[in-house]
Amino acid sequence: MGKVRIGFYALTSCYGCQLQLAMMDELLQLIPNAEIVCWFMIDRDSIEDEKVDIAFIEGSVSTEEEVELVKKIRENAKIVVAVGACAVQGGVQSWSEKPLEELWKKVYGDAKVKFQPKKAEPVSKYIKVDYNIYGCPPEKKDFLYALGTFLIGSWPEDIDYPVCLECRLNGHPCILLEKGEPCLGPVTRAGCNARCPGFGVACIGCRGAIGYDVAWFDSLAKVFKEKGMTKEEIIERMKMFNGHDERVEKMVEKIFSGGEQ
């Protein structure tokens, strides 16, 4: 059996996810079993149009050129993995509700650029994604678990419980109930070991909403409302890393429209 061919690809992002991966000494242990055939951040001579067994994609789709790139990656890869908040949820750059033209003008002014811009969107908007690695940046253990599982021919399990569970297991005081801060732990996918609450900081939801339709934004919005937050403040808070989750505005609106008292 030959080596597993792996490719790392970057779209619109801060490159923090790739940097996190590049700094992992454990990658050297892959050499006997895997071949990295594309990683432009590490090797500028990398060719993106290569057949691979596993493709790891970082960043949100923000240009027409990137739409074509992810489609080509999907054609070439047996398994596609979205890595990090930008690739999985669209990232903080997809948070704003302002018109694209206004945002473009603010960033680039009158400068001419060679690419065609579009609103930042998750990779799954354009191609089938087989597995997600969450976080901003992702946890090293999550990447190693996923990759190691793929290499032995199995499939990694997804995380389906909230940050609150890890918070309780670690014995942290509840940021939401005890400090009264707008913590998103109840609706955010776990896996970070409740790092921010562990330091007394409210979760901002960088790992995205829990899957399987169990992210109850409405229940949390009710708590936020009781603490004096406006509808706009709640939506802004919840959409920071969930800009493309249609449930947010619908569920928050239900609380403020009298749908739930």
UniProtKB/Swiss-Prot annotation:
Top-level class of the enzyme under EC nomenclature: oxidoreductase
Catalytic activity: H2 + NADP(+) = NADPH + H(+)
Residues annotated as binding [4Fe-4S] cluster 2: 164, 167, 174, 183
Binding site for [3Fe-4S] cluster: 192, 196, 203, 206
Co-factor binding details: Binds 1 nickel ion per tetramer.
Compartment list: Cytoplasm
Entry GO terms, CC: cytoplasm
Temperature optimum or stability note: Optimum temperature is greater than 95 degrees Celsius for hydrogenase activity. Stable up to 100 degrees Celsius. Loses 50% of activity at 80 degrees Celsius after 21 hour incubation.
GO molecular function: 3 iron, 4 sulfur cluster binding; 4 iron, 4 sulfur cluster binding; hydrogen dehydrogenase (NADP+) activity; metal ion binding
Residues engaged in binding [4Fe-4S] cluster 1: 14, 17, 86, 136
Main location group: cytoplasm
Pfam families xref list: Oxidored_q6 (PF01058)
Enzyme Commission number, as recorded: 1.12.1.3
UniProt cross-references to SUPFAM superfamilies, sorted A to Z: HydA/Nqo6-like
Keywords, sorted A to Z: 3Fe-4S, 4Fe-4S, Cytoplasm, Iron, Iron-sulfur, Metal-binding, NADP, Nickel, Oxidoreductase
Transmembrane segments annotated in the record for this chain: none
Activity vs pH: Optimum pH is 8 for hydrogenase activity at >95 degrees Celsius.
Cofactor annotation: Ni(2+); [4Fe-4S] cluster; [3Fe-4S] cluster
Database matches in Gene3D superfamilies: NADH:ubiquinone oxidoreductase-like, 20kDa subunit
Known function: Part of a bifunctional enzyme complex that functions as an NADPH-dependent hydrogen-evolving hydrogenase with sulfur reducing activity. May play a role in hydrogen cycling during fermentative growth. Activity not exhibited with NAD. The alpha and delta subunits form the hydrogenase component that catalyzes the reduction of protons to evolve hydrogen.
Subunit record text: Heterotetramer of alpha, beta, gamma and delta subunits. The nickel-containing alpha and delta subunits constitute the hydrogenase activity. The beta and gamma subunits (flavin-containing dimer) constitute the sulfur reductase activity.
Sequence similarity: Belongs to the [NiFe]/[NiFeSe] hydrogenase small subunit family.
Annotated protein name in UniProt: Sulfhydrogenase 1 subunit delta
Source organism per UniProt: Pyrococcus furiosus (strain ATCC 43587 / DSM 3638 / JCM 8422 / Vc1)
